[in-house]
Swiss-Prot record:
A GO term, aspect molecular function: ribosome binding
GO CC annotations, alphabetized: cytosol
InterPro entries the record matches: NA-bd_OB-fold, RNA-binding_domain_S1_IF1, S1_domain, TIF_IF1
Assembly with partners or alone: Component of the 30S ribosomal translation pre-initiation complex which assembles on the 30S ribosome in the order IF-2 and IF-3, IF-1 and N-formylmethionyl-tRNA(fMet); mRNA recruitment can occur at any time during PIC assembly.
Name of the protein described by the UniProt record: Translation initiation factor IF-1
SS bond list: none
Keyword Cytoplasm attached: yes
Organism annotation: Saccharophagus degradans (strain 2-40 / ATCC 43961 / DSM 17024)
Known role: One of the essential components for the initiation of protein synthesis. Stabilizes the binding of IF-2 and IF-3 on the 30S subunit to which N-formylmethionyl-tRNA(fMet) subsequently binds. Helps modulate mRNA selection, yielding the 30S pre-initiation complex (PIC). Upon addition of the 50S ribosomal subunit IF-1, IF-2 and IF-3 are released leaving the mature 70S translation initiation complex.
Amino acid sequence: MAKEDNFELEGEVIDTLPNTTFRVKLENGHVVTAHISGKMRKNYIRILTGDKVKVEMTPYDLSKGRITYRAR
């Protein structure tokens, strides 16, 4: 799978789930389940409910994503 197939959307964390998984409401209104990317996990970046995040998604499964950035 080529990296160009992925696309990024912005959203807000609305719920924290087990195993560093979060429920994120995207700016278009959809709610997806997202996990933290490896670099964020390695650098111990904490994500709390209400944080603005960027979610990287693949067109193959639009219900799951990967959190790649947390806005301050």
